[in-house]
From Swiss-Prot:
Fluoride-specific ion channel. Important for reducing fluoride concentration in the cell, thus reducing its toxicity. Na(+) is not transported, but it plays an essential structural role and its presence is essential for fluoride channel function. Its main location: membrane. It is found in: Cell inner membrane. It catalyses: fluoride(in) = fluoride(out). InterPro entries: FluC. GO terms for molecular function: fluoride channel activity; metal ion binding. The gene is fluC. It comes from Thermotoga petrophila (strain ATCC BAA-488 / DSM 13995 / JCM 10881 / RKU-1). This is Fluoride-specific ion channel FluC.
């Protein structure tokens, strides 16, 4: 039922968005001296790990229902991670300091891909 799918995604997304706000705000307030927005790096890295873990585990180890994938993958983790904030922050940093902006983009991508890789390994049960 399509309407139930939308509600499942919306409920997960609402939780993910609030979690992203809380985690990002907490990280950035604990480390106000940072030259880059660490909150976004943290949420994108953690979200990449858990989404990769979830999907690879669901495919290869423990089949998940469509509803669980919609809730956790599309909804919660989709809203928890934030590509739009990453691109906005990157452009803002590039305007201030091109080197800092590029470094931020590279660190964000490196951490997210590394976390996704470890999520894949653990999701497949290869550890």
């Amino acid at each position: 039922m399509i309407e139930l799918d939308y509600l499942t995604i919306a409920f997960g997304g609402a939780i993910g968005a609030v979690l992203r706000y809380l985690v990002s705000r907490t990280i950035n307030s604990l480390l106000p001296f940072s030259y880059i927005p660490l909150g976004t790096i943290i949420v994108n890295s953690v979200g990449s790990f858990f989404l990769s873990f979830l999907m690879f585990a669901a495919i290869e180890k423990v089949p998940l229902s469509k509803e669980a994938i919609l809730f956790f993958g599309t909804g919660l983790l989709g809203a928890f991670t934030t590509f739009s904030t990453f691109t906005y922050e990157t452009l803002s940093l590039i305007e201030e300091s091109p080197a800092r902006g590029v470094a931020y983009a590279l660190v964000n991508l490196l951490f997210a891909f590394t976390c996704a890789y470890f999520g894949m390994i653990l999701g497949r049960g290869k550890v």
